[in-house]
Amino acid sequence: MRFASLGSGSEGNGLVVESGGTRLLLDCGYSVKESEFRLARLGLAPDDLSAILVTHEHDDHVGGVFSFARRHALPVYLSHGTFEAHRETHAQEAIGVRVHLIGADTSFAIEDLQVNPFTVPHDAREPLHFVFADGATRLGVITDTGCSTTHIEKTLSGLDALVLETNHDIDMLWASSYPWSLKERIAGRLGHLDNAASGQIGRAHV
């Protein structure tokens, strides 16, 4: 199994997970053209992908998903809550796209990869993150998450590799010029992991 990031940040997110002949794109927060460019830098074309998975409805994760999927005839896997939340503001985007609704803790296969979605605390409708397995390797991916939970700890046990968000230094956040409401959102239990919390999760599971 291999993985590579298309990018990570408020402007967009995307990650490719590969095993055998299967390549999954996790999130697509970029435009179609930008996503194609970033794939090409990895030596990949859209036709090399098998499907797109979505973590949640925030634009930096889902902004390009349906346009890219429609352009390249790719199925999209996401939770019911994420799908409905996105449709409330982008009602027409999913037309012509094969959508598969998935739920937490219900594993499924996409070709050579087994996918285990799990729920995380984040300020979205029904966010999911994922553990990928191919019979030899288990890879966990956890990005936009406010805090760790017992369920997350259990789900991430026994991994071979972990892609983990390290979003901010808590002291620098509180000292920053961000509006107070944004500071509270980022630091809250439904926000983003600070560097220390991410380090604790990483040390415990890899």
Where are these regions (language model features)?
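Structured catalytic core of nucleotide-sugar glycosyltransferases
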Residues: 4-15, 54-65, 69-70, 87, ...
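Short internal beta-strands
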Residues: 74-83, 165
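Active-site metal-binding motif and surrounding structural segment of the metallo-beta-lactamase
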Residues: 33-78, 160
